[in-house]
Each structure stands twice: as structure tokens, then as C-alpha cells.
């Protein structure tokens, strides 16, 4: 499952530091969070989709790595992002 181009553009505008920002950790984590939420909804109706579940776990691991990187580089930005996305940690 992927997110629409409009959804991705909205996330980039909301979490980006400047116009066209696609590479900052905040934007990457926000896009991954959106994809994870979409897949989570998918698995509520498709419980036996184990191949897709593996992809979900890879996305969660990638998001975790990016969050760890951001925490090591700038604790304040990390805390701000966690609060804005509503992630627990």
C-alpha cells in the first residue's frame, strides 16, 4: 500500500523545513508514519496477508532508525517530532 501524491505533498509541506524538502529526517519519518498507518488499516481487513506484514515491519524498522539518528543529532527536534506525530517513546 502506498500513499497518494497529494498526501505525500501535504506531509512534506507540514513537516518540511523549507519548500521542496524531501530529505530531512522529519519529513522521512512523517511519510513513513503515514504509510504505516495505511498498512495498519489494510491489515484490519486482510489478516492473513503475511507478505505485506513483513513489509510493514521493514517500514517500522526504517522509521526507528531515522528516529534514532534524529535523537542523536538533535534531541529537541526529535522530541518535537514525536509529539507532533503522536508516537510513543
UniProtKB/Swiss-Prot annotation:
One of its GO terms (biological process) is translation. Pfam families: Ribosomal_S15. GO terms for molecular function: rRNA binding; structural constituent of ribosome. Residues 1-24 are annotated as: Disordered. GO terms for cellular component: cytosolic small ribosomal subunit. InterPro entries: Ribosomal_uS15, Ribosomal_uS15_bac-type, uS15_NS1_RNA-bd_sf. Keywords: Ribonucleoprotein, Ribosomal protein, RNA-binding, rRNA-binding. Residues 1-21 have a biased composition (Basic and acidic residues). Part of the 30S ribosomal subunit. Forms a bridge to the 50S subunit in the 70S ribosome, contacting the 23S rRNA. One of the primary rRNA binding proteins, it binds directly to 16S rRNA where it helps nucleate assembly of the platform of the 30S subunit by binding and bridging several RNA helices of the 16S rRNA. Belongs to the universal ribosomal protein uS15 family. NCBIfam families: S15_bact. This is Small ribosomal subunit protein uS15. It comes from Ruegeria pomeroyi (strain ATCC 700808 / DSM 15171 / DSS-3) (Silicibacter pomeroyi).
Amino acid at each position: 500500500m502506498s500513499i497518494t501524491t497529494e498526501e505525500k505533498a501535504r506531509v512534506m509541506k507540514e513537516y518540511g523545513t523549507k519548500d521542496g524538502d524531501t530529505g530531512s529526517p522529519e519529513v522521512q519519518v512523517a511519510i513513513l508514519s503515514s504509510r504505516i498507518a495505511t498498512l495498519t488499516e489494510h491489515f484490519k481487513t486482510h489478516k492473513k496477508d503475511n507478505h505485506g506484514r513483513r513489509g510493514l515491519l521493514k517500514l517500522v524498522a526504517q522509521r526507528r532508525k531515522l528516529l534514532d539518528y534524529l535523537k542523536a543529532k538533535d534531541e529537541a527536534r526529535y522530541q518535537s517530532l514525536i509529539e507532533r506525530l503522536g508516537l510513543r517513546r
